[in-house]
Amino acid sequence: FAVPQISVRPDRVPETHRAMLRHYLALMAQLQAVRMAPLRAESPHLLYPLVRARKDETEAIVCYDANQVVHLSDAVRTYVFNATGVEKLLMHGANASYTSYDCRGAETGKGMLAQPYSEACIPAGGYAVVISV
């Protein structure tokens, strides 16, 4: 959440990797106020599978375990990062729409969270922007 660590030489990685780095660094700058807000790491007995931070009406949640339910708050905009090895996450929270993106920022889909529990298709290493409606 705070400081990125880039442990590769940018001139020695493929362009697709550099594109991913550029995208995530720009996204980190965009979400700086959220990243600097207090962190809440959940379920220490499960090795913190969910970490979240919120600033005003924007929240960021990172999910590290595909077996977790991502509980959405009342934030207007929530960024849900998929740090698991699967292509979908189970979300709890209705009346929201989402747009998912891959790790380079390319849109991969849209969906609605119409039921209290809904699966969202989010690429591994990607994220979704959830908007309350």
Model-derived segments and their meaning:
Residues F1-G125, I131-S132:
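Active-site-proximal substrate-binding groove within the catalytic cores of carbohydrate-active enzymes
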